[in-house]
Amino acid sequence: NERIKEVVERLSSGGVVAIPTETVYGLAAEVTNLQAIQEIFFLKRRPSDNPLIVHVSSLKQLSEISKPLTELELSIINKFWPGPLTLILPRKKKVLDAVTAGLETVAVRMPLHSLCLDLLQRTGPLVAPSANLSGTPSPTKKEHVQNDFGPSFPILDGGACSIGLESTVISCRTSHLSTTRKNVPANSKTPSQSDIIIYRPGAISEKQLSEFGTVEYYSASQAEQDSAGSIPILPSPGLKYRHYAPKARVEWLSSIDRLWAATETSIVLLLDKTQL
C-alpha cells in the first residue's frame, strides 16, 4: 500500500499524521520522537499535563514500553485486545515524560482496525490522541479532521470509524499505586481495593469488565478533588479538562411546541418525554 508507505516515511521523519482507528481518528507520532509529540500538543492546543495513549500492534510492542503484566492485566488484554480498551500500566523508564505527563504509568491499547494495525506493525508504537482541537467532539471520519486542521492536513483515510466513541480506560488493582508523578511522595489517600478502576467510560462496559473482578468508577468529584490538590493523580485522558463540547447553542425545552420553534442548529434536549 503506497499510502501507508508515505505515512510511515512521514512519521519516521518526525511528522504528525491523522490515522484511523475503530474508535476515533487520532493524531499519530512516533512514541520516541519528542519534537513530534510536542507538535501534537501544539496542534491540538492540549495541556501538557494531559497524558497520551500509546497504540501498539502486539504484546511484543507493549513490552517495549510497559513493565511485565500481571495475570489480571493479561487476562483482560487477551479478552478485549485488539479493541476499544486502554490499560494504564507501569511504564518503562525509556518512555518519554511528555507521553505520560510525568506519571510512572503509561496508557496503552491495541486498536481493532486493520489499516491502523498494518501501520503500527511497520512503525512500532505510536501516540495517537484524538485528531481534534482539545475540548471539541472527536473525529470519526477524515472530513472531521479536515474541519479542525484544514484540507491539506496529512490523513491516512480508513473510512468512517466503526465505533465512533473513545476507548474505555482502566487500571487493575496492582497498578493503582503507580499513578503518582515521579519524585513526588504518594499522598495519604487509601488506594482503591477494587480489582478494576474505570477512569473513562467507553465502548467496553462495566458489565463486561466485571467478569474479571470488582469494578468501580473514578468519579468526577474525585478527579476534581485530586486535580485541585497539591499532588494531582490524573493518570488518564478525559479526567481534568472539558471534552466533546460541540460548538452549538443548547436549548432546554419543556414542551413539544418549543421543539418546533427550535432552530436547525440547536441540540434539542427534552426534559419530559411524556409530552411527545
Residue ranges, per PLM feature:
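Active-site-adjacent structural elements in enzyme catalytic cores
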Residues: N1-L276
